[in-house]
Amino acid sequence: MASPTGTVAPTDFGRSGLLRWLVAIVAFPIGGTLGYALGGPAATVPAALISGLITGAVIGLGQALALGLRPQALVLWIAATAVGLGVALAIVTAIIGQIDTSTDAVLLGAVSGLAVGAGQAAVLLRERAGRALVWVGASALAWAIGWFVTTGIGVGLAPGWSVYGLSGAAVSQVITGVVLWKLLAPGEVASSAQA
């Protein structure tokens, strides 16, 4: 939930916030499907950028709604997620080509999580979440594990898919949800506001 000033209200996150965050899992397959359908397979840098931007916008929207962000912070979160995923996917595609192996997917996850996490951490810092920079590493790890889980259970996503499947989304949202729960704990926000 958001406070009247538009910041994340840490006392409201708790269990209900974590549950809302977990419901946002559905944004991953929806975003991936739209990104693939509208941007095409991420086989070229332009297609990767477009697909990543679309996918990231949908994921960012789902997550921002789960956080209960007010309009300005909501827009910033969506933009950070879209740009982070779009740029990361384009960079990885430029370096290694189309993602078609488990190793490529985990690398994409780490780079995407790092880029998305950096942008989202900036929003968390703006919203006075304590130790928001932890979010960058947690996101990189969660996104890499998400891709590992999806490819590890034998899900054969079509080459050029911009984001992992529902199984990977569940794992990454649990990891990041627990980190958010800690970052948005009342003592964490209060201590960062005093700093």
Give the ranges of each region predicted by the language model.
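Juxtamembrane/disordered regions of integral membrane proteins
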Residues: 2-195
